[in-house]
Regions:
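Interaction interfaces in information-processing and related assembly proteins
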Residues: 1-85
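Short alpha-helical
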Residues: 28, 98, 110
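Short metal-coordination and nucleic-acid-contact micro-motifs, chiefly zinc-binding Cys/His arrays
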Residues: 84-87, 108
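Cys/His-enriched microdomains
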Residues: 89-92, 110
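Short, cysteine/histidine-rich loop/knuckle motifs that typically chelate Zn2+
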Residues: 93-94, 114
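Short functional micro-motifs and their immediate structural scaffolds
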Residues: 98-99, 117-120
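Short Cys/His-rich "knuckle" micro-motifs
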Residues: 101-106
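Cysteine-rich micro-motifs
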Residues: 109-118
Length: 120
């Protein structure tokens, strides 16, 4: 039996694939955050007769999206750091393997399903 299957941790090939996905997602999030910053700096000029309430709601939505992206970006950074330190794939809380299926669905998961449910 292969060691990765035995431990529930990704093998070297799986780890490379997950690292590639994390790095790709990080690049997308950084581009989105840059766009949020540019939009915030530019501001939406009020048009004559424009709907101020709608503009305010759009700004709030943009801020919420930027905060979500920043949180995901932070999780990705932690996951990449754990890859470098050899701790990737181990639950932060119980130290058991997170599991292939969970990491495939969410490569920046830091907890196993059970601990994440208890943490939420």
């Amino acid at each position: 039996m292969n060691a990765a299957v035995k431990t529930g941790l990704p093998d070297a090939h799986g780890l490379r694939a997950l690292r590639f996905r994390l790095q790709g997602r990080r690049a997308v999030l950084l581009a989105e955050l840059r766009a949020h910053v540019r939009a915030a700096r530019a501001g939406a000029p009020a048009e004559p007769g424009g709907d101020e309430v709608l503009l305010a709601q759009l700004r709030e939505l943009d801020l919420a999206e930027a905060q979500r992206d920043a949180g995901e970006l932070e999780s990705i950074g932690v996951a990449l750091g754990r890859m470098e330190s050899g701790e990737y794939g181990m639950c932060l809380d119980c130290a058991n393997p997170i599991g292939h299926a969970r990491l495939a669905a969410n490569p920046h998961a830091l907890r196993c399903v059970e601990c994440e449910a208890a943490h939420a």
